[in-house]
């Protein structure tokens, strides 16, 4: 079954034959579209007036709507007009002259007829788009950090520099990337300073151990002999 809310329908031949689209003939134009219900009250009135030329001339849009109010069942009515390029048509179920239940809404815009999407369809589309962008963001965030037992989670300096050089990156993101880059370099500098501080201590320990007689050397470190 065709999904009508994805259909765009138009008939330039019909409009040319009827010398344009107006409020008094837009429902007749709509009746040619696949959105029209052939068992609606509109069709019943059209069949009744089709061969009655005198009644057809008197049946203006206002009189047509008044006749629909006397009936019960499915009907199409014009709810908004902005000539010459916009009409809103509502499909509804009439229960009595004062009470109706809306079913769907249609737009006639510049000779094109559309069906308005439902609220559920709009929400589904928005949630799907949001989920897709969240998935992309999480995939990119997972690839940013790297882990090592000695340093924990770190960010590659090349990744930070590349991201910071992108002109399309927002200022807030650039500031965060700059902070991460400075923290990363500070951590590296701290580790290098720690290694340089303990290097003389290690050298002194090795010199002291080498001065003790009978102490063998194993890979640059002095191990005392067991007695």
Curated annotation (Swiss-Prot):
Q: Where in the cell is it found?
A: Nucleus
For region Disordered, the annotated ranges are 149-172, 204-227
Main localization of the protein described in the UniProt heading: nucleus
GO biological process terms, alphabetically, are: regulation of transcription by RNA polymerase II
**One GO CC term of this entry?**
core mediator complex
Q: Which UniProt keywords apply?
A: Activator, Nucleus, Transcription, Transcription regulation
Please give one Pfam family short name.
Answer: Med6
Composition-biased stretches (Polar residues): 149-162
A Gene Ontology molecular function term of the record:
transcription coactivator activity
Nucleus: present as a keyword of the record? yes
Family label: Belongs to the Mediator complex subunit 6 family.
Q: What is this protein for, i.e. what is its function?
A: Component of the Mediator complex, a coactivator involved in the regulated transcription of nearly all RNA polymerase II-dependent genes. Mediator functions as a bridge to convey information from gene-specific regulatory proteins to the basal RNA polymerase II transcription machinery. Mediator is recruited to promoters by direct interactions with regulatory proteins and serves as a scaffold for the assembly of a functional preinitiation complex with RNA polymerase II and the general transcription factors.
Q: How does it assemble?
A: Component of the Mediator complex.
Q: What is this protein called?
A: Mediator of RNA polymerase II transcription subunit 6
Give the source species. Yarrowia lipolytica (strain CLIB 122 / E 150) (Yeast)
């Amino acid at each position: 079954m065709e999904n009508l809310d994805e259909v765009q329908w138009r008939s330039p031949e019909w409009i040319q034959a009827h010398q344009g689209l107006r409020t008094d003939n837009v429902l007749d134009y709509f009746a040619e579209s696949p959105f029209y219900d052939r068992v609606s009250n509109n069709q019943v009135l059209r069949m009744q007036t089709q061969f009655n030329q005198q009644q057809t001339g008197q049946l203006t849009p206002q009189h047509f709507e008044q006749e629909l109010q006397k009936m019960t069942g499915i009907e199409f009515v014009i709810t908004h007009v902005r000539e010459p390029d916009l009409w809103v048509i509502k499909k509804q179920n009439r229960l009595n002259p004062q009470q109706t239940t809306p079913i769907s809404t249609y737009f006639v815009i510049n000779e094109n007829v559309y069906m308005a999407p439902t609220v559920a369809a709009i929400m589904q589309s928005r949630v799907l788009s949001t989920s897709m962008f969240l998935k992309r963001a999480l995939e990119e965030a997972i690839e940013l950090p790297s882990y090592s037992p000695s340093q924990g989670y770190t960010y590659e300096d090349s990744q930070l520099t590349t991201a910071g050089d992108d002109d399309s990156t927002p200022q807030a993101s650039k500031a965060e990337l700059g902070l991460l880059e400075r923290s990363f370099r500070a951590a590296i500098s701290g580790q290098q300073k720690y290694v340089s501080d303990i290097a003389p201590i290690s050298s002194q320990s090795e010199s002291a151990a080498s001065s003790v007689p009978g102490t063998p050397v194993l890979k640059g470190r002095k191990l005392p002999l067991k007695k």
